[in-house]
């Protein structure tokens, strides 16, 4: 194969690892790089409204496909994206951040270029990103550039953390051997140390053998680090009761007869709390124990027999086995577990959320009814995205269909995240299956931060469902502090004017205020098909919130007030 430009090499490599959409914005230090996207068949440039939204979109895309790329320009562009990149770092999402930077000669001369701080320091932004990246590289040598690109792509995928790649403008068009593309990037994990893994498996088997009431608890990193299949098989083979955390929604099949619900410490349903906390063995997969994921750290296991499977270590009771990756540990555990669980006597699992009682069609829509009812509308394989606030808490009441994807930023909690994430997820879903539905639930306050990205959805003909929960302001903040404070109020928008304002030609608008209107719309066979982009405004009472959010707000307020 003949020589190709370094820029084309980057995008060919990304295409090889199943990245088909590139997010970001143009800027004069990355324009030559962006030209190369159009030289690679099967790639498209999303062209976002701003860099923060682009970072959110890259995050949403990577949560579905395992890897994404964001391209920004030096200084002003890359810094605008860093909130989104920090969220990806916190929540284990593999985003490669590619930054077009000034030429090597301009940096050497310390020229006072635009987009700099005016002090000749061209490394300051790179250093900022280093704190929220698994690895970084500023390319300075064309000879080693291809191997550095390969290293960053591999690291981003394997660790499911962001990486930073700085590409000087003068290197993008330099040539590298095209033959390097013939050897694929190795995305496989290194095997576990056999002795350490054997000790883990033997110890876990002994704990299982001596337990009478074990449970499985699936969390965020079961999805992020690609052990959903192993976790589901663990449930199938053992028949142990299985639960998820808020961040674990979508990591196991919630239609499975052994699924018991969402465990959030003191915020759990009483029967779920009792089932998990009375267990004599907890098998925890991919735990991410943040405050909102644990009911403000209110886990209260009665047993000390807890096994935590993590991406790069396993913890058995008080012993930590560094370097024992859960992917292989679970796979090898599954080979030997059937003989150990033969004598297991199945215990009942908590009843799933009961259906709503019949109410008159004129009944005003409220959150408690909405989230229970939503399960009826969802379909197998849906991507369900819930914004920080009432949606992220309410969705825990909803039972997901099989093979659903759940996206919610419970740890980082940057309001407005889900608009961009919906765009990214919609691109990814379209690439997997054009009929796959992407469904967003976002509050009226959060939407105002990132609404511009709806225009990108329209531009590309994407067809998500955009459910806007309109309850007049920042409800979660009102519940925590300042229920009538002016700073928790927002300007009222005409939500049904948004799609045409952004230039949509084919779209649907709906406004729902009663349970009857919800039922009529969500049971309509045409509405159930993702044929056009839709915005559905849900009119809800002020201060209406899921019970779990009200309790969490009280816990958060108490935590904030502690001296």
Curated annotation (Swiss-Prot):
Cofactor names: Mg(2+); thiamine diphosphate
Binding residues for Mg(2+): 444, 471, 473
Subcellular locations according to the entry: Cytoplasm
Binding-site positions, thiamine diphosphate: 390, 413-415, 445-446, 471-476
CDD domains cross-referenced by the UniProt entry: TPP_PDC_IPDC, TPP_PYR_PDC_IPDC_like
Modification Phosphoserine occurs at: 223
UniProt pathway annotation: Fermentation; ethanol fermentation; Amino-acid degradation; Ehrlich pathway
Alphabetized PROSITE patterns for the sequence: TPP_ENZYMES
Cellular-component GO terms for this entry: cytoplasm; cytosol; nucleus
Practical application: Fusel oils and acyloins are important flavor and aroma compounds in yeast-fermented products contributing to the quality of beverages and food, e.g. fusel oils in whiskey, contrary to common believe, seem to alleviate hangover. In general they are desirable at low concentrations, whereas high concentrations may spoil the product. By adjusting growth conditions and substrate their production is sought to be influenced. Due to their broad substrate tolerance pyruvate decarboxylases are important biocatalysts for chemoenzymatic syntheses, both by fermentation and in vitro, e.g.
GO MF annotation terms: branched-chain-2-oxoacid decarboxylase activity; indolepyruvate decarboxylase activity; magnesium ion binding; phenylpyruvate decarboxylase activity; pyruvate decarboxylase activity; thiamine pyrophosphate binding
PANTHER family reported for this sequence: PYRUVATE DECARBOXYLASE, PYRUVATE DECARBOXYLASE ISOZYME 1-RELATED
Function: Minor of three pyruvate decarboxylases (PDC1, PDC5, PDC6) implicated in the nonoxidative conversion of pyruvate to acetaldehyde and carbon dioxide during alcoholic fermentation. Most of the produced acetaldehyde is subsequently reduced to ethanol, but some is required for cytosolic acetyl-CoA production for biosynthetic pathways. The enzyme is also one of five 2-oxo acid decarboxylases (PDC1, PDC5, PDC6, ARO10, and THI3) able to decarboxylate more complex 2-oxo acids (alpha-keto-acids) than pyruvate, which seem mainly involved in amino acid catabolism.
The protein's name in its UniProt record: Pyruvate decarboxylase isozyme 3
Species: Saccharomyces cerevisiae (strain ATCC 204508 / S288c) (Baker's yeast)
């Amino acid at each position: 194969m003949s020589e190709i430009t370094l820029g084309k090499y980057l995008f060919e490599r990304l295409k090889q690892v199943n990245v088909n959409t590139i997010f970001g914005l143009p800027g004069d230090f990355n324009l030559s790089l962006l030209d190369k996207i159009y030289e690679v068949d099967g790639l498209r440039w999303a062209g976002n409204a701003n860099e923060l939204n682009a970072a959110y979109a890259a995050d949403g895309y990577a949560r579905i496909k395992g890897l994404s790329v964001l391209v920004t320009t030096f200084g002003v562009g890359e810094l605008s994206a860093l909130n989104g990149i920090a969220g990806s770092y916190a929540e284990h999402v593999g985003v490669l951040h590619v930054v077009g930077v000034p030429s090597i000669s301009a940096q050497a001369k310390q020229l006072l270029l635009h987009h700099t701080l005016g002090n000749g320091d061209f490394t300051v932004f790179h250093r900022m990103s280093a704190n929220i990246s698994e690895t970084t590289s500023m390319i300075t040598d064309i000879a080693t550039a291809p191997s550095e690109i390969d290293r960053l792509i591999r690291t981003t995928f394997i660790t499911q953390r962001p990486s930073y790649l700085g590409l000087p403008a003068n290197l993008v068009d330099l040539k590298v051997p095209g033959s390097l593309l013939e050897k694929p990037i190795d995305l496989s994990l290194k095997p576990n140390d056999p002795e350490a893994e054997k000790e883990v498996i033997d110890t876990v088997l002994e704990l299982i053998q001596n337990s009478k009431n074990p449970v499985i608890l699936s969390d965020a990193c079961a999805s992020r680090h690609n052990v959903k299949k192993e976790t589901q098989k663990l449930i199938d083979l053992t028949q142990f009761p299985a639960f998820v955390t808020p961040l674990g929604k979508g990591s196991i099949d919630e239609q499975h007869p052994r699924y018991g619900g969402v465990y959030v410490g003191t915020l759990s349903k009483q029967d779920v709390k009792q089932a998990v906390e009375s267990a004599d063995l907890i098998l925890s997969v991919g735990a991410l124990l943040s405050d909102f994921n644990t009911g403000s750290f209110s886990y209260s296991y009665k047993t000390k027999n807890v096994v935590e499977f993590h991406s790069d270590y396993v913890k058995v009771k008080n012993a930590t086995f560094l370097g024992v990756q859960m992917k292989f540990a679970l796979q090898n555990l599954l080979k030997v577990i059937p003989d150990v669980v033969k004598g297991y006597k199945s215990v009942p699992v908590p009843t799933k959320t009961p259906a709503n009682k019949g109410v008159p069609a004129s009944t005003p829509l409220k959150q408690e009814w909405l989230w229970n009812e939503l399960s009826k509308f969802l379909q197998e394989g849906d991507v369900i995205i819930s914004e920080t606030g009432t949606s992220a808490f309410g969705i825990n009441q909803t039972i997901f269909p099989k093979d659903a994807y759940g996206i919610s930023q419970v740890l980082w909690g940057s309001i407005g995240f889900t608009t961009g994430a919906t765009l990214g997820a919609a691109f990814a879903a379209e690439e997997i299956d054009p009929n796959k539905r992407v469904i967003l639930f976002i509050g009226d306050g959060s939407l105002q931060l990132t609404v511009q990205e709806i225009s990108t959805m329209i531009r590309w003909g994407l067809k998500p469902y955009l459910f806007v929960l309109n309850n007049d302001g920042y409800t979660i903040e009102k519940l925590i502090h300042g229920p009538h404070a002016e700073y928790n109020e927002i300007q009222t928008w005409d939500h049904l004017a948004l799609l045409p304002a952004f230039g949509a030609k084919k779209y649907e608008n709906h406004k729902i205020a009663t349970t009857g209107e919800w039922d009529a719309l969500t049971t309509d066979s045409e509405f159930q098909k993702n044929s056009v982009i839709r915005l559905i405004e849900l009119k809800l009472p002020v201060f209406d919130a899921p019970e779990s959010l009200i309790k969490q707000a009280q816990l958060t307020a108490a935590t904030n007030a502690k001296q």
